[in-house]
């Protein structure tokens, strides 16, 4: 509950937005100014005492009814916006999930951000030809909207304006529109055909991402740039002509367009960001003098960057000397590649560079490489051993995730950071030494490494992230150095062979489910430094019978020791100190 005092004269935009537990509000008569819509995504009861506004039939207007601030009827199926309304405010109809149809009068010139966001039953709406722009998120989540006529007055379509309009089948973008925002039609999975008008100059990032039914697309020769992921996952798109007007193509622009047979990079293109063609296996042709395309490999002009390798049949490849960067997803899903030679000129291996190269078994990373990107070797299931050179300072998230044959890896002293999920699912990895240069182990780094029986954790480490060693079922003993201050949620959950662990005096908190289902753990001494033990921290530790909890511990969450078979005297002592909630 909240009472707006009579001293208040102005209420700001979104002031009570998303206050889901607030049952009611009264706008006092002192309020003379309301900015935007203070009440979006709030469904409570509203009352207005101010003479500066009109509140009738659960709709809040300004005094002359030129501005519709908030529509609050959650049950109505249709609504006619009164003639004379000029502006529909930000999120005015948000989450009105019962509304099926709305009539917009010709007086309306402005529709605010997210005006109809979440109107999931809305199937019919006519936009008047006085509206000049469709703002960001205007129809976001209007999943029942089947068709829409965008009038010639509209000059721009905002970011994510029609995101998730999964029933929208067809659309004509009029000649008046000059820009299509990021994610404008993201997830419009029923959209089958589209004509981009002659006036559009830019197609935003992810503009048509996930339009999986889109078969026909015409891009006009007014377009100069195609954004990142603009047509990503348009899996039914069969043909596309990039016009000669385009000078720039974004990263992942045609990613996962699995039905697209061919593409031609026109001579007008001078800039390619990242890899526009990742997860696409069609035929590529390049007419641009700004790039080199030879033997099914796309490079930049001076061949310092390998953008895309497109030979799906080759079993081996030698990257030319002089290449400095292996681009994002450059070799993605090259299932036939068994070996690859990387020259000493390479300094960077990009995100997902060898993702899905399931036959790759022979690889040497040269001393010139300083970083291994996110998911760089994700799913390289035949890779058995790897030496990471002393030049590498960072290993990205998911870098070796799913490398299930990787049994031996050497991590150098130069390494300072290991990203989340970096070795997740490396089920053959037996032992590992983490160097002193590493200060933290992120979430899920060694999750699912079920053969990992021996690991050395350095004194430099200060934190062990959530799920860091979850499911390492062969890990039998572990010494946590006294530099560590926190053990994250589920950090050692499912380590069924872990029978001996020493928690140092530096640790102050043990996270939720940190040692859940460590069924071999028989004894444990919690140090004086620990003040709290998380929810279910030792749940399912069925062999744990000997436990020492110091007086420093003042909070033990529910179920912390559920399923632990303590002797009766120890169990009663713990119940006396912390209550029976810790066992249920």
Predicted regions mapped to residue ranges:
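Structural signature of tandem-repeat unit edges
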Residues: 1-10, 20-33, 43-59, 71-87, ...
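Consensus positions within tandem repeat domains that build extended binding/scaffold surfaces
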Residues: 12-17, 36-37, 90-92, 112-117, ...
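Short acidic-glycine loop/turn motifs at beta-strand connectors
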Residues: 62-65, 300-303
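Short, conserved loop/helix-junction motifs that constitute active-site signature segments
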Residues: 278
